Amino acid sequence: MNRLFRFEDPKIMELFDKRFISSIFKKVSVLEKCVSRVEEASGLRFPEYYIEPILPVYFDNSGGIAVYYARTIPYVAPSGLDIVIQVSAAMLKYGSKSSIEAILAHEFLHYLDLVRRISKFEIVSDEVRGSVFETLYSDLEKIIKPEYVYADRKLVRTLKKKFADGFEDEKLKEKTLSDWINKGKPIIQLSPEENMVRIPVSTILASKFDPILLLRIREIEKKAGLA
């Protein structure tokens, strides 16, 4: 997958100056190194991912703001169900290497849990609503503990520290607010309810995943007491 395909849209390019876009492109190598570390620590291949130029945010009634720096998104592809990680350009632009690694490692846990639940059809029984033949998957719901997945203890410590109570990085948050949101760079407002993806049950039932990935997930389940 072309990580930067969203920036090929002329309408997107008009939203940023050339210098800013160039700075994003230059940090792609940092993103790739962070992905490699997650892969090495887990012994698994990271799913496809791309950089999203429009920042998803949520404003609550009390004036607080939540930023979706990355999201795990299942979607219906021509070949069946597929899963992609959406990485925000804001995170790539303003995030430190340790924060980018932590966010990617966190999303990878969401990815593994989603594959686990779909492969066992748990997501069907959990989330089909009423008589509507579709299921809802929330990116914020369930997650596998990092120590069951990652052999890299430093990465596990960083992940637990950064996500002790939601994601915590004041410097990244301040830069995102001051240099992205307050300066009018593109955002899309998503409530927690809207940050959900509808997946047809027929697609879930026909889903196929890499046998090696499923075997590793079963090993993780045993460690976590989920088997």
Regions picked out by a protein language model, each given a short descriptive name:
Residues 116-168:
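Post-HExxH zinc-binding segment in Zn-dependent metallohydrolases
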Residues 16-30, 126:
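A short, highly charged nucleic-acid-interacting micro-segment common to nuclease
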Residues 58-98, 111-115:
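Active-site scaffold of zinc-dependent metalloenzymes
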Residues 5-19:
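Acidic/histidine-rich, surface-exposed loop or edge segments in extracytoplasmic proteins
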Residues 4, 153-227:
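Pan-zinc metallopeptidase signature
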